[in-house]
Amino acid sequence: MSLFDHSVSELHKKLNNKEISVTDLVEESYKRIADVEDNVKAFLTLDEENARAKAKELDAKIGAEDNGLLFGMPIGVKDNIVTNGLRTTCASKILANFDPIYDATVVQKLKAADTITIGKLNMDEFAMGSSNENSGFYATKNPWNLDYVPGGSSGGSAAAVAAGEVLFSLGSDTGGSIRQPAAYCGVVGLKPTYGRVSRYGLVAFASSLDQIGPITRTVEDNAYLLQAISGLDRMDATSANVEVGNYLAGLTGDVKGLRIAVPKEYLGEGVGEEARESVLAALKVLEGMGATWEEVSLPHSKYALATYYLLSSSEASANLSRFDGVRYGVRSDNVNNLMDLYKNTRSEGFGDEVKRRIMLGTFALSSGYYDAYYKKAQQVRTLIKNDFENVFANYDVIIGPTTPTPAFKVGEKVDDPMTMYANDILTIPVNLAGVPAISVPCGFGANNMPLGLQIIGKHFDEATIYRVAHAFEQATDYHTKKASL
């Protein structure tokens, strides 16, 4: 039995009782990485020397009264979250040699909680992708079946947790990039409310949509991690000054009287039968615990995909303009003048998907098209947000599938961008509205690949979605299933 089969609270107790050491936890992580990483390919960079030194330092503090629950816990960090002195590439060749000189706020907070960073996790380049096949280095595989994708863009973050390489990880979610891979890999992933977690130190893809969040084996562990990284940050102007409650207090298993909305659009055309049936089965479980549900409509969700790709690509075209070979990152050697420097550095450094989205965004923002595309997309975004607010006036949570289908095979969709984009049709509306949502395991498809249940909450009401997710988790055994890698 792996130490990582235990929860954070169980491991904390073992540490305090001196049944295990922090070094044991770190070595457990690196041993598992040595055993499976050649197949899974979840990591881009390991930090073994520093992690082992930190573990030794923390071992001397075991049993101290001020040790928090995350003390000594091994974590993986998505490679678009900057880490001081530890290579951060965004899985792009253009940043292949980039060593940041500061820590992201979330990394600072986790260091203050005495977690130990095991390494940096693979992803789709600059978080643009749904399968991890867009990594500029190599594709991560799904631990449940190496022939399948782990999802994206936080594919490495989800795969590392599912494979037992780390206890938990950080990902980022712009249009589903935490929840979708969490669903595909059979783990728990939360996208917090926009502004709940500081984005300072997150390399920007689409600044009005990006959010950092936790990926874990259980809902309880997820709540511990969100508790540690949430809160106002003066370094991030979009960070919200909203009180962070006690997420653990609501994990009682009680959902009696809870009002659940189920959008008909989330169970209709484009959603596979396996995903639909798994959600209906989950609703029966929650009904049996005293919750009620009704079908509702989110009428503008059908426009979410087009809206998202116009807005996110527009923001990306601006955000990625800084990668020009002048200030940091890789610089082309094939240069005769300044224009060559810009053009060749970006042509050689960016992958196809990143180039595709930069071009789309530049077009949407260009003179003569701004009103027709970008401005109209912003107006539709407001309508989508209003849809959610109208539903939440009468219901506590919204529930549906996280993805239309289980994970697909490696190479199956990589040459068809539109089919690939459709994997995010159920997660994107949440980002456009800025509300929080969690994915928890809720079954398996015919290919024995995991399915995820998406629970969506009101702005800054992560506590309620944790309560529902935890109640469902404890009433079922899906969270106990493990990839047999």
UniProtKB/Swiss-Prot annotation:
> Is this entry keyworded GTP-binding?
no
List, in alphabetical order, the Gene Ontology terms for molecular function in this entry: ATP binding; glutaminyl-tRNA synthase (glutamine-hydrolyzing) activity
Catalytically driven reaction(s): L-glutamyl-tRNA(Gln) + L-glutamine + ATP + H2O = L-glutaminyl-tRNA(Gln) + L-glutamate + ADP + phosphate + H(+)
Which Pfam families did the record assign? Amidase
Instruction: Kindly indicate whether the keyword Protein biosynthesis belongs to this entry.
Output: yes
Alphabetical UniProt keywords: ATP-binding, Ligase, Nucleotide-binding, Protein biosynthesis
Name the Gene Ontology biological process terms: translation
Which cysteine-cysteine pairs are annotated as disulfide bonds in the entry?
none
| InterPro entries given in the database record | Amidase, Amidase_CS, Amidase_dom, AS_sf, GatA
| Enzyme Commission number(s) of this protein | 6.3.5.7
GO CC annotations on file? glutamyl-tRNA(Gln) amidotransferase complex
The active site lies at 78 (charge relay system), 153 (charge relay system), 177 (acyl-ester intermediate)
* Family indicated by similarity: Belongs to the amidase family. GatA subfamily.
* Assembly mode: Heterotrimer of A, B and C subunits.
Q: What does this protein do?
A: Allows the formation of correctly charged Gln-tRNA(Gln) through the transamidation of misacylated Glu-tRNA(Gln) in organisms which lack glutaminyl-tRNA synthetase. The reaction takes place in the presence of glutamine and ATP through an activated gamma-phospho-Glu-tRNA(Gln).
- NCBIfam families, from UniProt? gatA (TIGR00132)
- Cross-referenced HAMAP family, in alphabetical order? GatA (MF_00120)
Write the protein's name.
Glutamyl-tRNA(Gln) amidotransferase subunit A
Q: Which organism is it from?
A: Bacillus cereus (strain AH820)
Gene behind the chain: gatA
